């Protein structure tokens, strides 16, 4: 990642800390991966605190594929089958079947309905019957070990919300440009600044976690 673009957001460790602070304050975070991977920026929010307004922003400026990042434990709790048995996608993204809240929604498409679905899926006592399948929210299963196991936006989301003190569940969506193309780092950073989001890279988070685990050992 071009460090010049990121310099105004501090060092790698400062960027992670700023991201955690943003989540604790109920704000979003722009998570960038490497140029030689997807080369994309994802807007992420803690599932517990995401507002209808934030969901609307995500739908308006994102790819439209609003994803709910979950742990394997939560996936099993909700009895969500993986979308395919043999995942042949380029980066092995862990999509499950799509979901909709069983109660409290209309068509499931609106920002309010999608937030209702997210809330239903992450509730402490959530059970499979609380969700209909298919739906308009796309759960993603994170790999155990987070970004130290797989350097994806899914794992970064779970790591960040967990480090910030929330349940291990977060919402993400890729940022797109107005013409429908994928936003790259310069556009992602500009968008984050306009919408009071922190900016962090997956590389930052890997370094941060490794250092903290080294100190703890």
UniProtKB/Swiss-Prot annotation:
Pfam families: DHBP_synthase (PF00926). D-ribulose 5-phosphate binds at residues 37-38, 42, 150-154, 174. The record marks 136, 174 as: Essential for catalytic activity. One of its GO terms (molecular function) is manganese ion binding. Mg(2+) 1 binds at residue 38. It is an enzyme of class 4 (lyase). InterPro entries: DHBP_synth_RibB-like_a/b_dom, DHBP_synthase_RibB. Keywords: Lyase, Magnesium, Manganese, Metal-binding, Riboflavin biosynthesis. Pathway: Cofactor biosynthesis; riboflavin biosynthesis; 2-hydroxy-3-oxobutyl phosphate from D-ribulose 5-phosphate: step 1/1. Binds 2 divalent metal cations per subunit. Magnesium or manganese. Mg(2+) 2 binds at residues 38, 153. Its cofactor is Mg(2+); Mn(2+). Its EC number is 4.1.99.12. GO terms for cellular component: cytosol. It catalyses: D-ribulose 5-phosphate = (2S)-2-hydroxy-3-oxobutyl phosphate + formate + H(+). Homodimer. Belongs to the DHBP synthase family. Catalyzes the conversion of D-ribulose 5-phosphate to formate and 3,4-dihydroxy-2-butanone 4-phosphate. This is 3,4-dihydroxy-2-butanone 4-phosphate synthase. The gene is ribB.
